[in-house]
Swiss-Prot record:
Homology family: Belongs to the endoribonuclease YbeY family.
EC number: 3.1.-.-
Top EC category: hydrolase
Species assigned in the record: Pseudomonas putida (strain W619)
Disulphide bond pairs: none
Name of the gene encoding the protein in the UniProt record: ybeY
Domain of life (superkingdom): Bacteria
BP terms from Gene Ontology: rRNA processing
SUPFAM superfamilies: Metalloproteases ('zincins'), catalytic domain (SSF55486)
InterPro entries assigned: MetalPrtase_cat_dom_sf_prd, YbeY, YbeY_CS
GO molecular function: metalloendopeptidase activity; RNA endonuclease activity; zinc ion binding
Name of protein: Endoribonuclease YbeY
Record's GO cellular component terms: cytoplasm
Residues noted as binding Zn(2+) in the record, renumbered to the chain: H111, H115, H121
Subcellular location, record wording: Cytoplasm
Length: 157
């Protein structure tokens, strides 16, 4: 079971709780243990501040992942970590890349959850594995390959 804390720190339109939960559960289904995580939906100012504080980048990015660093045995429910998603960046990217907003949201939530599970895309082989899993999960939802046009790669971090 997934214990999901959803925090909306913006008045912008965002996917509903059920959609956010469904995307997380899809990405986390390989994990058999109960899990706890937070998704915080933020505006451009908070997104920029967090990206600057934690990554020393002076711009808002689409999704930030903060994996928990607490041993599972110390918790009642293992804490995966937190995702911070910058709503205006997601909206802007979807429009610029000609993607449906729903598909882009699903991609970024799944992408962030995979980071919480330890996936990464720094090395080419890691990126290939992570992107293949993202493609598979998004296809199950009926969404197109988010990497079909590499010039419009949606992951900016």
């Amino acid at each position: 079971m997934l214990e999901l804390d959803l925090q909306r720190a913006t008045d912008a339109a965002t996917p509903d709780d059920a959609a956010l939960r469904a995307w997380c559960e899809l990405a986390l289904r390989q994990r058999s243990a109960d899990s706890e995580m937070t998704i915080r939906l933020v505006d451009e100012a908070e997104g920029r501040e967090l990206n600057h504080t934690y990554r020393h980048k002076d711009y808002a990015t689409n999704v930030l992942s903060f994996p928990a660093d607490v041993p599972d045995e110390l918790l009642d429910i293992p804490l995966l970590g937190d995702l911070v998603i910058c709503v205006p960046v997601v909206e802007r990217e979807a429009a610029e890349q000609g993607k449906s907003l729903q598909a882009h949201w699903a991609h970024l939530v799944i992408h962030g959850c995979l980071h919480l599970l330890g996936y990464d895309h720094i090395e080419d082989d890691e990126a290939e594995e992570m992107e293949a899993l993202e493609r598979e999960l998004l296809a199950e939802l009926g969404h197109p390959d988010p990497y079909a046009d590499d010039e419009n790669d949606s992951i900016t971090h």
